[in-house]
């Protein structure tokens, strides 16, 4: 975290400013990714993007133009590709038949998870984070992108199913963070920042009164 503090402090001293019109983009090295892992990354984003955008409090104007959600028809086609598909085939599906990998400002770059960046410069890009000069939030954003990237690489398969925003979104998203491996004191501050915009009880899915064992324990302690 000290590294992030020094870097953010350097930006501030250089005159950096942020506002609601701009975002923070996180690039992750894509050299370890395969067509299957990129398919996984898109599927994870599709599944979690509704609650993710709520957790990140993404500016609606940015969502409409600069960090759109996953294109469902495109993902459906990519998920139907055979497991041994090539990167060239995946690239054609991402660009919907053409090859825009040589274009800096190709239209497919304006998505929360940007695979154009993979084909253009070799990095997987997340564009959904709000701009900030808070070192803790910067670290949380980068850590989340790295964790999703790692899960996409390590996971053998994924499903294309939206995660519903339940009556307790804080618990739902915390569960996702724990499944990504963001567990323990090392990631406590990361979880705090990523959960700060979500209502609900982070530790309990339902009202504590609905758990008989917990109620019995309380009665015994009286």
What do these predicted ranges mean?
Residues 39-130:
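Aromatic/basic-lined ligand-recognition segments
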Residues 3-4:
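Short, small-residue-biased leader/transition segments that mark boundaries at the very start
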Residues 27-37, 64-71, 167-171:
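Short, conserved secondary-structure transition motifs
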């Amino acid at each position: 975290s000290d590294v992030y503090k020094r870097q953010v402090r350097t930006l501030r001293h250089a005159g950096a400013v942020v506002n609601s019109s701009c975002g923070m983009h996180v690039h992750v090295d894509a050299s370890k990714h395969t067509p299957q892992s990129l398919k996984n990354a898109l599927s994870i984003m599709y599944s979690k993007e509704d609650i993710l955008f709520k957790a990140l409090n993404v500016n609606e104007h940015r969502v409409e133009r600069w960090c759109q959600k996953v294109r469902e028809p495109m993902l459906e086609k990519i998920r139907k590709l055979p497991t041994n598909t090539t990167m060239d085939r995946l690239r054609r599906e991402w660009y919907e038949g053409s090859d825009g990998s040589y274009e800096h400002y190709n239209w497919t770059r304006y998505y929360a998870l940007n695979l154009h960046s993979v084909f253009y410069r070799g990095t997987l890009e997340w564009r959904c984070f709000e701009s900030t000069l808070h070192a803790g939030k910067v670290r949380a954003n980068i850590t989340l992108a790295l964790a999703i990237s790692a899960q996409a690489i390590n996971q053998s398969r994924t499903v294309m199913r939206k995660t519903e925003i339940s009556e307790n979104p804080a618990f739902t998203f915390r569960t996702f963070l724990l499944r990504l491996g963001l567990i323990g004191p090392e990631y406590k501050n990361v979880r705090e920042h990523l959960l700060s915009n979500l209502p609900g009880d982070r530790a309990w899915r339902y009202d504590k009164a609905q758990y008989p064992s917990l109620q019995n324990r309380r009665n015994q302690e009286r």
